[in-house]
């Protein structure tokens, strides 16, 4: 039995579909758990890249199902995610599918991947005001896929998890306890990116991975994190995705007096959100 046929008939291992939903982009990958953990994805596509290639470990799988070959992006992130997922399911009709979602904020409650149920979803929705550009789109995709098939398993992996175990002195603000009890603290983000970098270092440069490191995540959103022995020690991000270095549309670190000044000048909350 050739490799392409095995992919369509092996029902003992699920296909894992991952979604990385940002404020204006979406990346999807599909992995066959029957392969090695570090094997290439079966399918991968960022938004507007319609050249999805199905891959074996090192070679492009040329017998690409037509359901993926003729895929085109949709008008919204959610519709695009649903369209991509539908095509993957059509390509592997006999396989169980598990969805894993990058979720930016897990708050103080979630620091390991969790299965998304009603309780988990409710808590993640509560965190949306802290990450208004990223949390709602990701949760919208989860809701849309759940609407397609109630039996699908959805797992959330959190950007904040990498920074969760930092010492309290690095994560606390000098604010009233009542605010700290509400979850006002330094969280740190881009954690999944930092975890991926650390895994590569541990594989290819294990001696370097154990040292004190400064790692930068540079894109539309940017952050810098100090790592020691593979663990986050400090990060330029704080309570939200606004702090730290200047970014594509965010000013980065601001003296809190600037916010007070803007309020005194009559800026509305909506105007400040748009500006910052």
Model-based region annotation:
Residues 88-135, 153-155, 161-173:
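Short beta-strand-loop/turn "lid" adjacent to the catalytic site in phosphate-handling enzymes
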Residues 31-38, 112-122, 169-178, 229-234:
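A glycine- and small-aliphatic-rich helix-loop capping segment at beta-alpha/alpha-beta transitions
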Residues 212-216, 270-276:
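Beta-strand segments within the central parallel beta-sheet cores of soluble alpha/beta enzyme folds
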Residues 101, 132-197:
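Gly/Ser/Thr-rich active-site cleft segment
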Residues 36-94, 115, 120-134:
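N-terminal phosphate-binding loop and adjacent alpha-helix
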């Amino acid at each position: 039995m050739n490799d392409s046929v095995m992919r369509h008939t092996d029902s003992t291992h699920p296909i894992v579909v991952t979604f990385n939903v940002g404020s204006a982009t979406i990346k999807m990958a599909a992995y066959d758990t029957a392969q090695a953990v570090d094997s290439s994805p079966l399918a991968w596509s960022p938004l507007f890249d319609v050249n999805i290639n199905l891959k074996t470990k090192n070679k492009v799988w040329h017998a690409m199902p037509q359901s993926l070959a003729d895929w085109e992006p949709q008008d919204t992130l959610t519709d695009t995610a649903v369209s991509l997922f539908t095509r993957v399911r059509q390509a592997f009709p006999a396989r169980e599918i598990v969805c894993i979602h990058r979720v930016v904020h897990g708050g103080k409650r979630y620091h390991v991947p969790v299965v998304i149920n009603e309780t988990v979803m409710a808590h993640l929705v509560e965190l949306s005001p802290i990450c208004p550009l990223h949390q709602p789109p990701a949760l919208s995709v989860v809701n849309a896929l759940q609407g397609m098939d109630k039996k699908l398993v959805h797992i959330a992996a959190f950007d904040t998890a990498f920074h969760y175990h930092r010492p309290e002195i690095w994560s606390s603000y000098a604010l009233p306890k009542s605010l700290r009890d509400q979850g006002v603290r330094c969280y740190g983000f881009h954690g999944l990116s930092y975890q991926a970098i650390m895994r590569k270092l541990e594989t290819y440069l294990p001696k370097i991975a154990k040292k004190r490191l400064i790692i930068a995540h540079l894109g539309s959103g940017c952050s810098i994190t100090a790592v020691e022995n593979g663990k986050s020690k400090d990060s330029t991000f704080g309570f939200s995705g606004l702090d730290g270095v200047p970014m594509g549309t965010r000013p980065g670190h601001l003296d809190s007096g600037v916010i007070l000044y803007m309020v005194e000048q009559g800026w509305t909350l909506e105007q400040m959100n748009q500006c910052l």
